[in-house]
Amino acid sequence: MLNHATLKKEAVRRVNTQFLSAERVAEIINRKGIAECIAGVAAYIEEDFLRWNDFDKCARVANHSAVGVIELMPVANARTYAFKYVNGHPANHRYNLPTVMAFGVLADVETGTPDLVSELTITTAIRTAAMSAVAARALARPDSKTMALIGNGAQSEFQALAFHHLLGIETFHLFDIDANATDKLVANLTRLGLKTRRFSDTRKAVKGCDIVTTVTADKTNATILTPDMIEPGMHINGVGGDCPGKTELHADVLRQGPVFCEFEPQSRIEGDMQQMPADFPVTELWQVLSGEKVGRSYADQVTIYDSVGFALEDYSALRYMRDVATELEMTETISLIPTLANPKNLFGFIADKRDAQGPVRAAVALAA
């Protein structure tokens, strides 16, 4: 928060916006450790979810096309405003581009000053996995040891690491319609010392698992999981159904047990629960974390977490990355906002730059 007395003494105030590039975030993760980063983001998420009512929240603003979606995800409290820009284009691999690309901003509510601009493509993968783990710790059986990963794309390693380090999952059952994706995941998880088993279809992969994570990318009303695949005590972590017309769970799977979500107004539009009537009962996860509502009631109960990704999680992740960058002395700044001698004279800023370039132009002209 700005000190007004200090502001009055300053003739010119320079706004230096902290910047975290993709390369800098990767360096931060390597120095801190990916497991610690996932755990750290999870802790920040829990902290912010327990302050749920302090935030001004809304469903994300989405622009849909035939090939994908572009979204803005805002959230704010009394001190800080945050947003994420994110896309979802399942066919981007054809152009050698990620399916999901994102960046985000933290800004000061009092002045509107952008304090941080950060990549969020890598960070979103970490926060999504961290959020899945936060939900599973509240909803899955505490003795869970095996998890099926249906969909072995860019998010899958992060999910596996989150569930291994935060919940103690020991073995991962893997399936993807793209065998190359599973090859990649097996290689990466084996390198990290995690146990994997690959399967030829979803039904075989989920059999006997304590937790089932679906994280597929196709923008279609799919039925990755059907009711006959669900076993007593399972926790379903549905990650991939995250926009209108994009689902992973058969509607009857949602009737197998209590359904939990992040922000109900958004989840009813975007989650697997978009298939259900408006009065279908759901519980927001913050209510479970705060103790207001019950999560899992008994060991054989099936629990379903219908995740779509919510702006508050990105706020948490941005806070974490900013704080760790500061801790590791890895901050850098950019000049995003012009420094004005007179805040009412924006045109003068352009003129000053033109005048400063005058001698350079004259020297170039003489040399010619």
Language-model-detected regions and their locations in the chain:
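N-terminal ligand-binding/catalytic initiation module
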Residues: 1-125, 133, 143, 312-315, ...
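Short helix-loop-beta connector
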Residues: 139-146, 168, 231-232
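Glycine-rich Rossmann-fold phosphate-binding loop(s) that bind the pyrophosphate
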Residues: 152-153
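N-terminal Rossmann-fold NAD(P) dinucleotide-binding loop
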Residues: 156-157
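NAD(P)-binding Rossmann-fold cofactor-contacting core
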Residues: 166-192
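Rossmann-fold NAD(P) dinucleotide-binding segment
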Residues: 203, 208, 219-235, 251
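Short, well-ordered coil/turn residues at beta-beta hairpins
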Residues: 213-216, 238-239, 262, 318
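Rossmann-fold NAD(P)-binding glycine/threonine-rich loop
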Residues: 229-234, 238-294
